[in-house]
Amino acid sequence: YYEAPPDGRHLLLQPAPAAPAVAPAAPASWPHQQRRQALDEFAAAAAAAADAQFQDEEEDGGRRV
């Protein structure tokens, strides 16, 4: 990345700091982790329901009104 000093002089490009190979997992007690898990479960349930409805329509020949 590039850092310019506040007085307007330009520095040479500096190598970016090394990022950890694996991000540490957030504790499950964090609220955003709980919301994410709930959203994941809801998305899985919605996908399963949509797939089941699609299968029903396929068995009926696709004519569902």
Swiss-Prot record:
Keywords: Hormone, Neuropeptide. Residues 17-28 have a biased composition (Low complexity). The keyword Nucleotide-binding does not apply. Residues 17-36 are annotated as: Disordered. The keyword Transmembrane does not apply. One of its GO terms (molecular function) is hormone activity. Transmembrane segments: none annotated. GO terms for biological process: neuropeptide signaling pathway. Monomer. Neurohormone that anticipates ovarian maturation. Acts as a true gonadotropin and stimulates vitellogenin biosynthesis. This is Ovary maturating parsin. The lineage of its organism: Eukaryota, Metazoa, Ecdysozoa, Arthropoda, Hexapoda.
